[in-house]
């Protein structure tokens, strides 16, 4: 049976085009459309779609408020369409925080000319989050509850259906989560490296808000994200977390307790030595490199600089970026972990390293931060 899709947009042209694109996949069936946020809320409750594609700027009720209402009344997998502007990035991040699972840039020109690439990407994203919706429904009664925290910033609003799990002292009372927390291997670490894609913004926020200001390692983060989004995302994370988080810039010196987010549309490399490592940002126009930034490239450079003194983590994401970079790290003696299938929005990138035998441990998102701290504490 095809996944049911509700298309929400105030543009009649965009509604028709998105509907035509999605209906080309036999796994998808657009069951209805909505022209504003309030209509989306009403139809989500009535029709119970598997996936909703949602515009942000709409009359009567905007996309962000619509997401909040839908997640409160009839939780549904939602894909946001976002403009490639700083303001569009901020709005999209708000929508993700409210409960949306993923986003795509709203490119009218590519949709208008019926680009095969744009259509294929849209169908792929919708199918993937529809599968997540189906998987989540099957696990609803058995999924352990998350543990809430009080974050640094009073501006954080945690969605009640997807609360931010945390342990202010990195200790949780949830027995199921505690069971997954590993004992330290006793290895020495100089760097924490994280790679992610679809579902990454929420996963990263959930992990990073739990880390204390005195976190002993620098952190590099590669999140597949457009160039217009990464500065806004880094700024948002910095406002919520105790550690410092910034969009990486060329020449940045890696410091403990600081996280560096790879800028969208470019590549982030690590150079120097393990005790004086710096970030190098490159403009890469090579058509051979699909992702900009690329987890493989950043992880590979970390392997050259830090050898085995890296804890590398692959979180939720589509595709297999990070597999070769993680393989390079592992060959140098680094520790590689993955996010488990149950807690991923898309179990693609973690699955790639799991199947290749690269990951040493597969952890739930709820237990990831505490496990990281335990591992690097060396007992």
From Swiss-Prot:
Domain Response regulatory: from-to ranges: 4-121
Catalytic residue positions: 197, 224, 321
Entry EC number(s): 3.1.1.61, 3.5.1.44
InterPro entries: CheB-like (IPR008248), CheB_C (IPR035909), CheY-like_superfamily (IPR011006), Sig_transdc_resp-reg_Me-estase (IPR000673), Sig_transdc_resp-reg_receiver (IPR001789)
Coiled-coil spans in chain: none
Gene3D superfamilies: 3.40.50.2300, Methylesterase CheB, C-terminal domain
Gene Ontology BP, a term: chemotaxis
UniProt domain CheB-type methylesterase: residue ranges: 185-379
Residues with the 4-aspartylphosphate modification: 55
Enzyme class: hydrolase
CDD domains per UniProt: CheB_Rec (cd16432), REC_CheB-like (cd17541)
Catalytic activity: [protein]-L-glutamate 5-O-methyl ester + H2O = L-glutamyl-[protein] + methanol + H(+); L-glutaminyl-[protein] + H2O = L-glutamyl-[protein] + NH4(+)
Record localization: Cytoplasm
Keywords, alphabetical: Chemotaxis, Cytoplasm, Hydrolase, Phosphoprotein
Example of a GO cellular component annotation carried by this entry: cytoplasm
Post-translational modification, as annotated: Phosphorylated by CheA. Phosphorylation of the N-terminal regulatory domain activates the methylesterase activity.
Top-rank lineage group of the source organism: Bacteria
UniProt GO MF annotations: phosphorelay response regulator activity; protein-glutamate methylesterase activity; protein-glutamine glutaminase activity
Family named by the database record: Belongs to the CheB family.
Domain-related comment: Contains a C-terminal catalytic domain, and an N-terminal region which modulates catalytic activity.
Role played: Involved in chemotaxis. Part of a chemotaxis signal transduction system that modulates chemotaxis in response to various stimuli. Catalyzes the demethylation of specific methylglutamate residues introduced into the chemoreceptors (methyl-accepting chemotaxis proteins or MCP) by CheR. Also mediates the irreversible deamidation of specific glutamine residues to glutamic acid.
Entry protein name: Protein-glutamate methylesterase/protein-glutamine glutaminase
């Amino acid at each position: 049976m095809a996944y049911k899709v509700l298309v929400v947009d105030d543009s009649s042209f965009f509604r028709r085009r998105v509907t035509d694109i999605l209906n080309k996949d036999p796994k998808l069936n657009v069951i209805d459309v909505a022209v504003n946020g309030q209509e989306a809320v009403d139809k989500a409750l009535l029709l119970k779609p598997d996936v909703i594609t949602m515009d942000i700027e709409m009359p009567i009720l905007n996309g962000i408020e619509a997401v909040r209402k839908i997640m409160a009344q009839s939780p549904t997998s939602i894909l946001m369409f976002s403009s490639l502007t700083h303001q569009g990035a901020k709005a999209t991040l708000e929508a993700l925080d409210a409960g949306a699972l993923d986003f795509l840039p709203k490119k009218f020109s590519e949709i208008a000319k019926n680009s095969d690439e744009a259509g294929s990407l849209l169908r792929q994203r919708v199918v993937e989050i529809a599968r997540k919706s189906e998987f989540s429904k099957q696990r609803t009664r058995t999924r352990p509850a998350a543990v809430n925290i009080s974050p640094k910033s009073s501006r954080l609003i945690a969605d009640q259906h997807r609360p931010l799990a945390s342990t202010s002292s990195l200790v949780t009372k949830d027995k199921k989560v505690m069971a997954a927390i590993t004992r330290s291997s006793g290895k020495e670490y100089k760097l924490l490296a994280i790679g992610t894609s679809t579902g990454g913004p929420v996963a990263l926020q959930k992990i990073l808000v739990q880390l204390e200001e005195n976190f002993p390692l620098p952190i590099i983060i590669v999140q597949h994200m457009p160039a217009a989004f990464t500065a806004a995302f880094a700024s948002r994370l910095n406002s919520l977390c105790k550690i410092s988080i910034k969009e990486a810039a060329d020449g940045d010196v890696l410091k403990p307790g600081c996280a560096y987010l790879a800028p969208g549309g470019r590549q982030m490399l690590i150079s120097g030595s393990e005790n004086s490592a710096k970030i190098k940002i490159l403009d890469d126009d090579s058509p051979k490199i699909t992702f900009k930034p690329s987890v493989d490239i950043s992880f590979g450079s970390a392997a050259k600089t830090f050898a085995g003194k890296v804890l590398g983590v692959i979180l939720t994401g589509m595709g297999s970026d990070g597999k070769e970079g993680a393989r390079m790290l592992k060959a140098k003696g680094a520790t590689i972990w993955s996010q488990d299938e149950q807690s991923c929005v898309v179990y693609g990138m973690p699955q790639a390293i799991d199947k290749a035998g690269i990951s040493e441990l597969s952890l739930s998102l709820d237990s990831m931060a505490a496990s990281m701290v335990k591992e690097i504490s060396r007992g």
